[in-house]
Amino acid sequence: MLRRILNIAIFGSVSLGFLATFAHAQNAPVWDDELKRYLTAQEMGQEDVYLTPEEAAKLMFPDSDHIRNEVITLSPEQKKLIQERIGWNFPETSFDFFIGETKGKIDGWALIQNTIGKHKPMTYMVGVDPQGEVLNVEVLVYRESRGSEVRKKRFNYQYQGKTPYHPIRINRDIINISGATMSVRSMSAGVKRSLVLVEELFLKPLGKGNAINMANRSDKGFLESLLGF
């Protein structure tokens, strides 16, 4: 009995110690190298909401008669192929698509992306036309204290016309935003993933994927394209 009581006491002490450590880690200050200071609680809790998914989808397909929503879950084989193409692994297995249609004809596909900026994820939508090119990019929610300029048209118009086979290199193909380099890299990665997802899930099954931009076709992953290799 005494041994049991001691075991319970020790286990309880360890559990409390773990919870205290976890709570401390959750509340630990975050250092910003560019600001050269710790982020304030207000900055860490910042969340600027600009658009709902439905509002963003309407901006993607302003002339469509109908916009429908479809959640697609990747098979393990599809996920593996897409990760190989973009050059990085991601945890998601399902993606939320909005499909614009006019008189039964598809005007394009748009999907919601959540990728980490500097400290927190940002939520945005990438639209892709039937030719496999970026139509538009719209930021729905931005959670960083700096860098919200990525939602401005003067920045995200740079993605328009990009295909899965175009490099998206910062300061070469995409002009960077001072103080928001990580957000720019994150959005560029999300745009590339969106293009590959649309091609693999929609264009190739329709027999269109292999015919798009064959002259620019490359087997390079995203990181190689990003760095210009």
Predicted regions and their residues:
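Bacterial N-terminal signal peptides that target proteins for export
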Residues: 1-10
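Bacterial N-terminal signal peptides
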Residues: 9-20
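Sec/Tat signal peptide C-region and signal peptidase I cleavage site
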Residues: 21-25
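Flexible, solvent-exposed loop/hinge segments and secondary-structure transition points
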Residues: 26-177, 181-185, 189-229
